[in-house]
Amino acid sequence: MKNWKFPLISTLLLLLTINVHAAPVELDRVVAIVDEGVVLQSDIDTSLKTVKINAQEKGQPLPDEAVLREQVLEKLIVDTIQSQQAEKMGIRIDDTRLEAALNDIAKENNMTLAQLQQKTAAQGLPYANFREQIRKEIAASEARNAQVRRRINILPQEVESLAQLLAEETQATVQYKISHIQLRVEDGATQADKEALEKQAEDLTERLKQGADFATMAYTYSKGPKALQGGDWGWMRKEEMPTIFADQITGQGKNSIIGPFRSGVGFHILKIDDVKGLETVAVTEVNARHILIKTSVIMSDEGAQRLLNTIIDDIKSGKETFADMAQRYSQDPGSAANDGELGFQTPDLYVPEFKHQVETLPVGQISAPFKTVHGWHIAEVLERRQVDRTDAAMKNKAYRILLNRKFNEEAGAWLQEIRASAYVEILQDDDGEDDNE
C-alpha cells in the first residue's frame, strides 16, 4: 500500500524534510540533537523559506515567526526520527525506483521532469538535494508503513458489516425495471392443487432462464395486476416496490430471473429487465489447458519447440488427443494429471506470456509454442465465462476503507510513541535556553 503521496508541488515541498544547506553562511549551528542525528539552523532556515513561498503562492496566512519556527523545528525532529527508523530497518531506495517516483510527481502535477527541476530551482532548492530528499521521504514512509501495519488488526466481522452498509447505501439509489408473473392459489385449493401450481411455477422459471419471452409468459399465465401489460412494473427503487419483491432483490444484475417464491396469494417470478445506478464488477474467467516442456542440459529451447510442434501436428491430424499428449509429455504435474486442464481462473493469475495467450487465443485453437519462466508451452482455451465479483469487490472496498482509517489512527499514535522515546535535546529554543527531552 502506498501511503506516501505527492500532491501539488507547493504542498509537497511544505511536507518534506528539507535537509538542504542554503548558500554558505557565516555561522551554521546545531539546533537540536535527535538520537544519533542533528537538526541544523540551515535546515530550519531552508524549511521556513519553503513554507513562506508556499503560503504566499496560495494566499494563506501564517502564524508569527516564533510559532512558525517552533512548528518547523518539530516537523524536522519527527522527520529525522523517521529517517533513522528507515536506516535501522535497512530500507534503501535505489535510483531506478527514485526516478520512477520523481516522474510520478511530475505527472501528477502536469509537469515534465524538466519542469519539475525548474520549479524546485525557482524555489531556491537545488534539484540534487530535492532528489535525495525524495529518496529519504520514500524510505521513511516505507518504515512507517511496515511498523504501523503490524499494529493493525481488521476482523472479518468488521469487513462484513461495513460491506453490508456500503451495499445498502448503494442500493438506496438503484432503480430496477422489473417484470412479474403471479400464479394465484385459488380459494379452496387442495394440497395437490398447490403442489401442481408450484411445479408449474418451477417449469415456467426454467423456460424463462432458457430464453422464453417473459412478456408472452406473463400474458399467458400471470394472474398479477400487471398481467395485461406483459407483467411490466416499470422503473422502481426497492423502497417503492411491494415488500415481497424488494426482499428478493439483493443486487442481481440485468436480465436476472428470480424465483419462484411463495407469498400468501401464490407463487411469483420476477425478471430484472434493466438496472440504473448499480455498480457491478464482472471478471472474465478462462478455462485453459496446456502442455509444458522444461528446458535442461539435455533439452534445449530448440528441442522443446520441435517436440511441441510435433505434438501440435499429431493433435491436429487426429492421431493423438490433447489430453493424451498432456498426460504423456507435460512437465506440469498438477495439470498433466487432469488432461492439461487448469480450470477456470482469471488471466491475471498467470505469468505475463501465458496471460497474453489465454486472453487472445480464440476458443478451441491451439497456440504456437511460447516460452515463459517455467519453460515452453502450448495452450488451448476451452471456455470463457463472465463471473460477477460485485460482492467480493464490495468487501475489498470495505477492507481498504477500514485499513485507511486504522492506518491513519495508528500512524499518529506510532509517531507520538517514537517521538516520546527518542532522545531530543534542543540546544537553543526561541528564548535562547537549552531544553532536554
Curated annotation (Swiss-Prot):
Domain PpiC: 173-274, 283-383
Molecular-function GO terms, alphabetical: peptide binding; peptidyl-prolyl cis-trans isomerase activity; unfolded protein binding
E.C. number(s) listed in UniProt: 5.2.1.8
Keyword Cell membrane: no
Keyword Cytoplasm attributed: no
One Gene Ontology CC term in the entry: outer membrane-bounded periplasmic space
PROSITE patterns: PPIC_PPIASE_2 (PS50198)
Any one biological process term the GO annotation gives: protein stabilization
Catalysed reactions listed for this entry: [protein]-peptidylproline (omega=180) = [protein]-peptidylproline (omega=0)
InterPro entries referenced in this protein's UniProt entry, alphabetically: OMP_Chaperone_SurA, PPIase_dom_sf, PPIase_PpiC, PPIase_SurA, SurA_N, Trigger_fact/SurA_dom_sf
Keywords: Chaperone, Isomerase, Periplasm, Repeat, Rotamase, Signal
Any Pfam family the entry gives: SurA_N
Source organism, top-level taxon: Bacteria
Signal sequence annotation: 1-22
Free-text note on domains in this protein's UniProt record: The PPIase activity resides only in the second parvulin domain. The N-terminal region and the C-terminal tail are necessary and sufficient for the chaperone activity of SurA. The PPIase activity is dispensable for SurA to function as a chaperone. The N-terminal region and the C-terminal tail are also required for porin recognition.
Biological role: Chaperone involved in the correct folding and assembly of outer membrane proteins. Recognizes specific patterns of aromatic residues and the orientation of their side chains, which are found more frequently in integral outer membrane proteins. May act in both early periplasmic and late outer membrane-associated steps of protein maturation.
NCBIfam families (UniProt xref): PRK10770.1
Designated name of the protein: Chaperone SurA
